[in-house]
Regions:
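PLP-dependent class I/II
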Residues: 1-179
Length: 179
């Protein structure tokens, strides 16, 4: 993937930058919907007054889990291990998909999704998704769910085990051969 750069790393921008981030992806806490804000001190109160009632009231166990994650990250390198695993899965899917006759994809650089081109299959995105789920129990998301320019594409997630991804690729190879 690509390493993002924060404006806060520049001395002239540090006091003008608000950083908003979450724990869901970095620490695999999907669904807990907890995040944090790093802001210059003078912006804290207005920001809190504006959003405090909308985003407060998190369960104690979630706060404790986030505290442990932050404190243990330097010791265990959890984020780097997960990043390396996702990178391995991404490379596997991109290589396999691009080896097929009817499917292709670009190398994603900012998420754990593949936007697979299915135009050579002769199916619409909705038709492909229905076929994959009905015949093979393979769940995909039609690209049209992300806008009209998504026609001819389906989204695949690689936020799963390598074993599950290998099975998905096996199914995609079968579909590719059937076309």
């Amino acid at each position: 993937g690509v390493q993002a750069s924060s404006p806060a790393k520049f001395d002239t921008m540090r006091d003008k930058t608000i950083i908003i981030n979450g724990f869901s992806k970095a620490f695999a806490m999907t669904g807990w919907r907890i995040g944090y804000v790093i802001t210059p001190e003078e912006w804290f109160e207005p920001l809190y007054l504006h959003t405090g009632h909308q985003v407060s009231g998190m369960a104690d166990f979630i706060i404790e889990a986030c505290t442990v994650a932050l404190n243990d990250e330097p010791k265990y390198g959890t984020i780097e291990k997960m990043r390396a695993e996702f990178d391995e899965r991404r490379k596997f899917l991109v290589k396999e998909i691009n080896s097929m006759k009817h499917f292709s994809c670009l190398n994603p650089v900012g998420a754990f999704y593949i936007f697979m081109n299915i135009k050579k299959s002769g199916m619409t995105a909705d038709e492909f998704c229905a076929y994959a789920i009905d015949k093979y129990r393979l769940a995909t998301i039609p690209g049209t769910a992300f806008g009209r320019n998504g026609e001819g594409y389906v989204r695949l997630s690689y936020a799963s085990s390598m074993e599950v991804l290998q099975k998905a690729i096996s199914i995609l190879h079968q579909i590719d051969q059937e076309l």
